[in-house]
C-alpha cells in the first residue's frame, strides 16, 4: 500500500477538459512519483502559483496553512489584545498560527526546541517571544512571557509543554487541539498525558476540542487566497526543509517526529519539467 500524504505536481497527461497538460495541482496522492486520478476526485485541486510555489501549496498555503488559519480563527476565536501561545512554533502549522495571530492583533508567544529555532521565531517571524522548552527554567520563562495569562493555546505537542501552559490559562481560554506529537510514540497511549486528559483535570476545564482541517473543506479556496495575499504582503513568512528522492522519505519522516526539521518537511521526487 502507498503511504498516505499530500503532494503537488504537474499534469503530464489528461483526457479531461477540467485538467489539461501543464496544469499545476495538489492531490492526496501519497508517497509516490505519479498518480492516476479522476477529475472529480475532491482531493485533487488546481493550484494558483500566484498564491505560492508548488512546495508552498504543501505548506503555508496548503494543508498546514489552512490548518493554522481555520484552527485559530474558527476554534481559537481570537480577539485583539489577547495572548496566544503556540507549541512547535517553528514548524509549518505553528509558524503560521503565530503570524496570523499577530495579523489579528494578538500577542504571540511561541514554544520551540533550541536557541536557533527560537531565534528564528522571534527575529524572522516577529513573534513577541519564543521560549525554549528544552531549557531548565522553561516554565518560569513561559510565565514571564505571558504576564497577562494565556487566552488561546494552539496545541501541537502535549505532555509537559501542555502542563506548563495549562497553569497559565485564563478564564474563558480556548484550546484548539491540532495534534500532540510528544504522545505519538507512547507505548501506553491510553494512559499518556494527552492534552485532553491534562485539560480535563483543570477546574474549570477550558473550552477545547480536537479538530481536522477537512471540517472546512468548502472554504479551502478562501483560506488559500488569504494566506497567499499575506505572503505577497510580506506579513506571512515560511521556511521549508526539502529532502531529495522518495527513497529518503522514511529518514526525513523519522527526523520530523524528533524535531529535526526546520519548517515544513518535504521530499522532492522530480523536477517540475
Language-model segments: residues:
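Glycine-rich beta-strand-centered segment in the early N-terminal region that forms part
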Residues: 1-31
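Short, well-ordered loop/turn sites that connect or cap secondary structure elements
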Residues: 18-19, 78, 169, 191
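Short helix-loop-beta connector
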Residues: 20, 51-54, 77-83, 147-150
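A structural motif shared across PLP-dependent enzymes of the aminotransferase-like
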Residues: 28-43, 219
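Mid-domain Rossmann-like dinucleotide-binding core that forms the NAD(H)/NADP(H) cofactor-binding site
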Residues: 58-136
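Glycine-rich phosphate-binding loop and adjacent beta-alpha segment
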Residues: 104, 160-236, 269-273
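Short amphipathic alpha-helix with an adjacent loop that forms part of the alpha/beta core around
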Residues: 137-148
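C-terminal capping/lid region of NAD(P)-dependent oxidoreductase domains
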Residues: 233-242, 250-273
